[in-house]
Amino acid sequence: ADPDPLQDFXVADLXDNAVXV
């Protein structure tokens, strides 16, 4: 996914980006 979880947490991988969000 992307290095910035707040960049596109809903657009990219939810299991890798917004995991922490």
From Swiss-Prot:
The keyword Secreted is assigned to this record: yes
Broad class of where this protein is predominantly found: secreted
GO cellular component terms attached to this protein's record: apoplast
Cellular compartment(s): Secreted, Extracellular space, Apoplast; Secreted, Cell wall
Entry keyword Secreted: yes
Keywords assigned: Apoplast, Cell wall, Secreted
Domain of life, per lineage: Eukaryota
UniProt similarity note: Belongs to the germin family.
Function: May subsume the role of germin at the low water potentials during embryogenesis.
Oligomeric form and interacting partners: Homotetramer.
Record's protein name: Pseudogermin
Organism this protein belongs to: Triticum aestivum (Wheat)
Lineage: Eukaryota, Viridiplantae, Streptophyta, Embryophyta, Tracheophyta
